[in-house]
């Protein structure tokens, strides 16, 4: 179990919310107070709610669910891509295409096209085309890679969405809600927490705050994955052991 400390949260600036004039009243339960026109998030609640979110993501990963990390704002792009890759999951960090979840079959066609273009470059098939055609295909691949590269290996809709700034990613959150996909999110003082299943109250604008919370969610995925692998291995060993016992029972004793 990865713990998050008050010291880590303070050092990363997770407690700084938005200006008091830019807030969503629904976030009032998560606000400690205001200082110099800025809302201060109640970090005691952040710690408690973070633990709930961490446990949920760990359990989901242990059950074999995939997690899609979403954060397309500039401050989140690097953390989202790097942490999702570190824990072997998927990400969207450039632009959310409408229907990415609700019309995944169509998006999958574009992913398959990207994979074909990758294969053409890898095996040299692209060399059979003219220079002009090669340039056109390379541009097409670059465009697809930018928007779909993070979900290239995702064969079906994810089991969980982890979102940085649900206000900015409202289409992604809306699609997840329609499909019944649980959403874990870093929710700042200007956000509506109603559509978020696991709210992590925190600063969703500071790079350090985003990195800290995103890396902890990646840790949760890794922890759940390790527990799943250990359980599967134990199950396989027990099955093998049982089969061995059956063989022994069926072998007649020597005279």
Curated annotation (Swiss-Prot):
PANTHER family the UniProt entry points to: 30S RIBOSOMAL PROTEIN S2 PROKARYOTIC AND ORGANELLAR (PTHR12534), SMALL RIBOSOMAL SUBUNIT PROTEIN US2M (PTHR12534:SF0)
Keyword Ribosomal protein: yes
Residue stretches of biased makeup (Acidic residues): 236-255
Protein name listed in UniProt: Small ribosomal subunit protein uS2
Gene Ontology CC: cytosolic small ribosomal subunit
Keywords linked to the UniProt accession: Ribonucleoprotein, Ribosomal protein
Biological processes per GO annotation: translation
GO molecular function per UniProt: structural constituent of ribosome
Superkingdom of this protein's organism: Bacteria
Region of interest called Disordered, as start-end residue ranges on this chain: 231-255
Family in the record: Belongs to the universal ribosomal protein uS2 family.
Pfam families associated with the record: Ribosomal_S2 (PF00318)
